[in-house]
Swiss-Prot record:
Family: Belongs to the FKBP-type PPIase family. Tig subfamily.
NCBIfam families in the cross-refs: tig
A GO cellular-component term linked to this record: cytoplasm
Recorded superkingdom: Bacteria
Pfam family, one: FKBP_C
UniProt comment concerning the protein's domains: Consists of 3 domains; the N-terminus binds the ribosome, the middle domain has PPIase activity, while the C-terminus has intrinsic chaperone activity on its own.
Protein name per its UniProtKB record: Trigger factor
Domain called PPIase FKBP-type: residue spans: 169-255
Gene name per UniProt: tig
Keyword annotations of the record: Cell cycle, Cell division, Chaperone, Cytoplasm, Isomerase, Rotamase
Compartments it resides in: Cytoplasm
HAMAP family documented for this protein: Trigger_factor_Tig (MF_00303)
InterPro entries recorded: PPIase_dom_sf, PPIase_FKBP_dom, Trig_fac, Trigger_fac_C, Trigger_fac_C_sf, Trigger_fac_ribosome-bd_bac, Trigger_fac_ribosome-bd_sf, Trigger_fact/SurA_dom_sf
Length: 556
């Protein structure tokens, strides 16, 4: 057998394969014998009918198709081994099957060509002796108050309002319908008893502003414009008229910030203790964010001189994974897996494709980073020791075992290995880089103090490694993994989100869960498995709701 290789765009390898006549004949004879042994012809025992009757019964075209299919499959597997190829896609023929059948002759050589996509290798330019600028993150005094106020807001009591119009900060219940610029109704945007918190950045731009000032039971037309990047392209940038009826207005009454409140939301006894703890956590988060900023700056500099030809198969896989991660927000809102699968299954194909297309640029960026780091690892012969890996795996397994969670050890081992390897290559790159630190205003500043004992460890998303849990798949989108913590709503400043996750207002536990103590490398989309929060892929975004600890009051 003769095999000729050629490089094709998109990390494809073209193969032209010529199979010698004697092998073609043997393959054809093998196909015939298999048919003879399995076909039942009246008047003959199975396997005993004359060949000419078998050919007549089965049909020459079917026999040829079976013979050609077997021959091609055997030939390409051998070609992969000889060429030392590890395909990541199916072999695609250059010619139509009918064309190959027409040229097939059991007594002659048989040739065909096609291609497969293979895992690409990045061509990295300069990665030693870099000079980069990184932003140092510092804790601002108001961040502690913002976190505490957010928890107070989550536990607010909702009080009915009847004597004034709606204002920012209220929670309202509305009915609404919608029509487009031509006056056509948009039935999918019609709903009743929709609860919405009146925040300037909530819902579709212009919608909240239109509700502010409305009186109870008032009906009003509100023009709102969808963002230009809205996932439904037919609505992106378009102005829609909503007919809104205001059913209820509720004002939020926040709990007093005292020791009793602190004891309710945490294991601390006093406000002072909570503030001291938050200060330390925010400082740690600021240091981590500074490190992440440095890693991002280094990776961006490396990518400027990195060339990689990404195959469409990898881009599709990464895009699908990002979309699955974005659906975590739905799980956090309390939507059950079955409901989520139903939601996905009912999405029109074009809508699903639009959702995936939104993640394509990020998918490409993540893949380029991963492949660039992989190339540096090979070039510099950076490795993870088996003892180091075993110790880390045991720590992760033990941490989750304490919570009664059963993990797949091999998958944990792979994730931990990738994380450790990423941490090692990033540490090596930092040692080779000159860093100019600046503050948030861009002014030169000192380097942040290194984290004490800061060994980067893999973050282990629970659903990534749960054993005996089949992965659901609807329209190519794996079931969204369940987030290990709930991010508080509202604007977040540097370090604030992580601190909020570490100290949820709805939990008393102060110590972080395993997913929090086992922190991921800041090199966002590199070698380790990681999660990243993304926008909820809902058509009409769900309103952020306060989380009162008591039922709505009818009055004070």
């Amino acid at each position: 057998m003769q095999v000729t290789q050629e490089k094709r765009p998109g990390s494809r390898v073209g193969l032209k394969i010529v199979v010698e006549a004697d092998r073609v004949k043997r393959s054809y004879e093998k196909t015939l014998r298999q048919l003879e042994q399995n076909i039942q012809i009246p008047g003959f025992r199975k396997g005993k009918a004359p060949r000419n009757l078998v050919v007549r019964q089965v049909g020459r075209e079917r026999i040829l198709a079976s013979a050609v299919d077997d021959l091609i499959n055997e030939a390409i597997q051998q070609a992969f081994k000889e060429a030392q190829l590890t395909p990541i896609s199916r072999f695609e023929l250059d010619d139509e099957v009918g064309q190959l059948l027409a040229q097939f002759n059991p007594e002659a050589d048989f040739s065909f060509s096609g291609y497969v996509e293979v895992y690409p290798e990045a061509r990295v330019g300069q990665y030693k002796g870099l000079t980069v600028t990184a932003t140092r993150v510092d804790v601002k005094p108001e961040q502690i108050d913002q976190l505490i106020d957010r928890w107070r807001d989550q536990r607010a009591t909702l009080l009915p309002v009847e004597d004034r119009p709606a204002q920012l900060g209220d929670v309202v219940v509305i009915d609404f319908a919608a029509r487009d610029a031509e006056g056509n109704p948009l039935d999918e945007m019609t709903t009743q008893d929709f609860q919405l918190e009146l925040k300037e950045d909530n819902f579709i731009p212009g919608f909240v502003a239109g509700i502010v000032g409305m009186q109870l039971d008032e009906t009003k037309e509100i023009a709102a414009t969808f963002p230009d990047d809205y996932f439904r392209k037919e609505l992106a940038g378009k102005t829609v008229t909503f007919i809104v009826c205001l059913r209820e207005i509720k004002a939020k009454e926040l709990p007093e910030l005292d020791d009793a409140f602190v004891q309710e939301i945490s294991s601390f006894q006093t406000v002072a203790e909570l503030r001291e703890h938050l200060q330390k956590r925010l400082e740690q988060d600021a240091l981590r964010q500074s490190e992440e900023n440095l890693e991002t700056a280094i990776l961006n500099a490396i990518l400027e001189t990195t060339e990689v030809d990404l195959p469409e198969t990898l881009i599709e896989q990464e895009t699908t994974q990002l979309l699955a991660q974005s659906l975590q927000a739905l799980r956090q809102e309390g939507i059950k897996p079955g409901e989520l699968r139903k939601f996905l299954s009912e999405l029109p194909p074009e809508t699903l494709n639009q959702l995936k297309e939104r993640h394509r640029p990020e998918a490409i960026d993540r893949l380029r980073r991963t492949l660039a780091l992989s190339a540096i690892v090979r070039q510099e012969q950076i490795a993870v020791g088996s003892t180091e890996l075993d110790v880390e795996v045991e720590e992760v397994m033990a941490a989750y075992a304490q919570q009664g969670q059963k993990l797949d050890r091999e998958r944990v081992r792979q994730a931990v290995y990738e994380s450790l390897l990423t941490n090692k290559v990033m540490a090596w790159l930092k040692s080779q880089t000159t860093v100019n630190w600046v503050d948030s205003e861009g002014n030169p500043t000192q380097a942040p103090t290194s984290l004490a004992g800061s060994e980067e460890k893999v973050e282990v998303p629970e659903a990534e490694f749960e054993a005996d849990e089949p992965e659901a798949e609807v329209s190519g989108i794996p079931e969204a993994v369940e987030s290990s913590s709930e991010t508080a709503t509202g604007a977040e400043t540097d370090g604030e989100a992580a601190a909020a996750e570490a100290e949820p207002a709805t939990e008393k536990a102060v110590e972080a869960s395993p997913a929090e103590t086992v922190s991921a490398s800041a090199a966002e989309a590199t070698l380790p498995v990681e999660e990243k929060a993304a926008e909820t892929a809902t058509e009409i975004p769900a309103a952020e709701k306060p989380k009162p600890s008591k039922k709505d009051k009818k009055g004070k």
